């Protein structure tokens, strides 16, 4: 009788693949090193001065941007952690205003076919305007860079919220409306028991799109005119043009993506908690 011995590496690899707790992480473990290796090779071809590789980015930004992300030397000389917090404060104000206004307006348009049809061309035109196109006129109106940046967030984020809220109301099944008529539900009971539960998934779909657009808008707006913020940090590093500027920009871009992903997941998580469909 012969016994086939498997190499230890093969055993470990098989255990990794079959382990239900580790298997979901396998694509990341495989793909991330490949991505970093390709990035390092491209960097070597183009030159570290043009595109720093991952090793150089970490080495050039380790102190203070990675180790001390919340340092504050006064003025706009702050760590990336503080710069992100400045941007998040602006996003929070603009996004919350857009959410409240968008849900209210979308609810009115969804319940009134006349207003919904009449204002649809206006909404479709305005929602296609790029965020930065609003910045000059907001500066002329508000005469303040911070308020203008918040307005850009608001005007960028509001449209998907309005549209999805209105669509959600229009998609309420006819059976639900027929039951409401048969039971002679009051307006209040109809809104609480039929309209809101049926519309919540659509509203959060709009909120999820809106938070991504809001984060994109603030980064771009801060590059044009702002005192602090992650967008300001990126543009300031570009204008500085020092040896570590490229590494600082790449690190900031990584943080921008990480925060954007976190905001998206946060809104999606809240939506799953609130939505009756997910229960």
UniProtKB/Swiss-Prot annotation:
One of its GO terms (molecular function) is nitrate transmembrane transporter activity. SUPFAM superfamilies: MetI-like. Keywords: Cell inner membrane, Cell membrane, Ion transport, Membrane, Nitrate assimilation, Transmembrane, Transmembrane helix, Transport. The keyword ATP-binding does not apply. PROSITE patterns: ABC_TM1. GO terms for biological process: monoatomic ion transport; nitrate assimilation. It is a multi-pass membrane protein. It is found in: Cell inner membrane. Residues 84-267 form the ABC transmembrane type-1 domain. Disruption phenotype: Mutant is unable to grow on nitrate, but grows normally with nitrite or ammonium as the nitrogen source. GO terms for cellular component: plasma membrane. The chain crosses the membrane at residues 25-45, 91-111, 149-169, 200-220, 249-269. Belongs to the binding-protein-dependent transport system permease family. CysTW subfamily. This is Nitrate import permease protein NrtB. The gene is nrtB.
